[in-house]
Regions:
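N-terminal Rossmann-like NAD(P)+-binding subdomain of aldehyde/semialdehyde dehydrogenases
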Residues: 1-75, 103, 116-117
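Residue-level signal for inorganic ion chemistry
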Residues: 6, 108, 140, 154
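Glycine-rich beta-to-alpha transition loops that act as phosphate-gripper elements at the mouths
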Residues: 89-92, 143-148, 166-168, 190-192
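Hydrophobic/aromatic ligand-binding patch that stacks against planar heteroaromatic rings
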Residues: 103-105, 153, 179
Length: 214
């Protein structure tokens, strides 16, 4: 899909999530033990996050790409590309769950999302949203269970290129980084909040040389 089409799909996810806002509010209030008012504000912010990330889809090259200065009769360009398959260890916050997924897929990555049991119900409802949002099959894959069991598997998996371990306690992150070192897996942890740095963390730069006048 083109960058523009990815943005359209992410925006469609926001629309479908908004259409089921009442369901998510009740599920989050129940599973997270928060008030209905707080759950409503959280779902509203989650919808806004999808729209925010959707807007980045066709602007990433303008921000991260470059024409590099060279001393010769040729051009040199740096172009950002998606890394590939990104695993995500989600925290039990629905908003952080959304942030991690949107940041990974907006650039064109596919994702394997590891979700703790405390967020299982909202995450499975969100999988239903994805199924009706024109998202190609296999782009976002959600697994629920114990992160203590799932995260080491993801860290050592040779076909996973990046790993967002924001949902893992800091004292356990070192072991995951060691496990991911064998295939040079790019492993990052982020704080809460939206930032383009989270998108760029799972992109790679390709440098292209081209002769002038050819």
């Amino acid at each position: 899909a083109t960058a523009y089409n990815r943005g359209q799909i992410l925006y469609r996810i926001a629309e479908m999530l908004e259409g089921r806002a009442d369901q998510f509010e009740s599920e989050i209030a129940l599973t997270s033990q928060i008030t209905s008012a707080k759950a409503k504000a959280l779902v509203s912010e989650a919808i806004d996050r999808w729209v925010w990330y959707a807007g980045w889809s066709d602007k990433l090259q303008a921000v991260s790409g470059a024409t590099n200065p060279v001393s010769g009769p040729f051009f040199n360009f740096s172009i950002s590309e998606p890394q590939g398959v990104v695993a995500i260890a989600s925290s039990d916050s629905f908003l952080e769950f959304i942030d991690a997924i949107a940041a990974a897929v907006v650039s064109g990555n596919t994702s394997v999302v590891l979700v703790p049991g405390s967020l299982a119900v909202p995450s499975m409802s969100f999988a239903e949203v994805l199924a009706t949002s024109d998202l190609p099959a296999g782009v976002i894959n959600i697994l629920t269970g114990s992160l203590d069991e799932l995260a080491p598997w993801a860290a050592s998996h040779m076909d996973i290129d990046g790993f967002d371990i924001s949902g893992i306690a800091k004292k356990k992150q070192g072991a995951l980084k060691e496990a991911g070192a064998e295939n040079l897996k790019r492993i990052h942890s982020f704080g809460s909040g939206k930032t383009p740095a989270r998108i760029l963390a799972f992109m790679e730069s390709k440098t292209v040389w081209h002769s002038v006048g050819v």
